[in-house]
Amino acid sequence: MSDLLVLLPVRHRRENAIQCAASFAATARDAELLIISDADDPSYDGIDWPQGVRTRVMDEWMPYVPKINKVALEVAAGYKALFAIGDDCVFQTPSWDRIMMGALEDMGGTGIVYPENHRRRDVPEQWMTSTDITLALGWFANPVLKHYWTDNTWAEIGRRAGCLKFCPDAVIEHRHYSVHKPTEYDAIYQQCEQFGPHDERAFQAWRASQMHADVTTVKKLLDAKGAGYKLTMKRDRG
């Protein structure tokens, strides 16, 4: 079983999902990919997915954040890290998963790592989080949100807790319509963008009232892990 599970929520974009999964299969060495679709969306029926790719069908549609949180909390205990992407992403770098997991191990196994995506470097649009952080917080994506500002959330927590790492050697291209001209500004983008005003307000409210507590939770986890690591090293040295 892999240490890393990639979570890919999908909706009405069959060709995107096929392309993303194919690029994953061509480049990943150890990771697994879980494609999360909805019972009311037959777009993905009959697809012969590559090896290492599994599927999960949700009973009812939910926005991106509650959907990915529900699945993440169900599977987190079985992995060292979870990685969130969208179906407009294409994996480019061979062994990107080993590169990113190596970066996480360099941080002691606890932290947030994000790849070069050719769109933004200031925030982790596609984030990989160690599952001890997910379990400590009780969420994988900020639960006050519906779709947007998840990247800003992890940027705030990671920088303030000192556990955010950009991994430029792992390239996973984000072919968002704003930077990739061939990408159509389709109904899915338009539907998601309706959540924008709500999510901005919710993020700012979280930042004012809850962020400090969440950062403290992660700092305590890092401190406890650091103390345990030092104790183990001391015992090993006799």
Located regions from the model:
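A conserved acidic beta->alpha catalytic loop
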Residues: 14, 35-48, 89-90
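Conserved donor NDP-sugar-binding/catalytic core segment of glycosyltransferases
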Residues: 89-126, 145
